[in-house]
Amino acid sequence: MAGVRLVDVWKVFGEVTAVREMSLEVKDGEFMILLGPSGCGKTTTLRMIAGLEEPSRGQIYIGDKLVADPEKGIFVPPKDRDIAMVFQSYALYPHMTVYDNIAFPLKLRKVPRQEIDQRVREVAELLGLTELLNRKPRELSGGQRQRVALGRAIVRKPQVFLMDEPLSNLDAKLRVRMRAELKKLQRQLGVTTIYVTHDQVEAMTMGDRIAVMNRGVLQQVGSPDEVYDKPANTFVAGFIGSPPMNFLDAIVTEDGFVDFGEFRLKLLPDQFEVLGELGYVGREVIFGIRPEDLYDAMFAQVRVPGENLVRAVVEIVENLGSERIVHLRVGGVTFVGSFRSESRVREGVEVDVVFDMKKIHIFDKTTGKAIF
């Protein structure tokens, strides 16, 4: 097995910079997620690691081997990188059986027939495909086809798996099941895996670490807890989480409040101290709080002083059964709360809303970078 390292990698297509100053280290055996919206550069990054695209600048290492460095004229072709890719499309050969589809990469490498048979059957057992080995792809469900595509990658025993949105063609229920299966499989095999997705749920539930990208730039790398609880900037904070984080413009006042114009909230002493030391008192900031950190006061699980209780008008209630997504307004300020199912708020009525000030985030108004 091997880790993967990118050092100051750029990719430019004409006048478009698809990837900019990308430096990332994926540890041996790690499940790394490349997460971001469409067009952020995540698939281009994966293709450069695979050798399907050549970087415009920078170095790429697989294990200790330098596989790409334009300045030194080094570019190792995909077949010599000991990687296996799984794509969004299953790319199975329709005229071949499941057995032959899985065996195909080994036949190309002229592996002895007996070894091919042994490895194919081992992989089929691992993926629950043993009973399907004689079937053709058209006779399989979407989930079964995806497992065959995975089997074809696994059977090669590569150093690194590269996966480009492999679950996006599956229906929602099957995606949930395949997420768990993929994570379990990666743990069993212990193979370094780099997985591209735009789906934050896939990223949060599957990855050891998540690399969040936007507009070709790496925004933050961290564990699911780190990128959720301590986002580096407003992009990461808003991209991860559903419903997304509330962002409100506010001014830090000299008496220790954040003032939204329509209402004020009392900062905790250590929060006000940090903002004071960094020169933010009297300045505009972006106040962030996740919907689950707002409570219907009747069911609040946190003890809150009166300064952090706000009376708001309920505009819309989305009943999800286990929770209620409540759209709220105070004058011209709007925000969203995720209330417990016991809350019976109705549209058009007023409700007292509790802000859990221990969970707030403050961002620089100009740069969007997190202050805390």
From Swiss-Prot:
It catalyses: D-maltose(out) + ATP + H2O = D-maltose(in) + ADP + phosphate + H(+). Pfam families: ABC_tran, OB_MalK. Its EC number is 7.5.2.1. SUPFAM superfamilies: MOP-like (SSF50331), P-loop containing nucleoside triphosphate hydrolases (SSF52540). The keyword Calcium does not apply. It is a peripheral membrane protein. It is an enzyme of class 7 (translocase). Keywords: ATP-binding, Cell membrane, Magnesium, Membrane, Metal-binding, Nucleotide-binding, Sugar transport, Translocase, Transport. Belongs to the ABC transporter superfamily. Maltose/trehalose importer (TC 3.A.1.1.7) family. Homodimer. The complex is composed of two ATP-binding proteins (MalK), two transmembrane proteins (MalG and MalF) and a solute-binding protein (MalE). Contains an N-terminal ATPase domain and a C-terminal regulatory domain. This is Trehalose/maltose import ATP-binding protein MalK. It comes from Thermococcus litoralis (strain ATCC 51850 / DSM 5473 / JCM 8560 / NS-C).
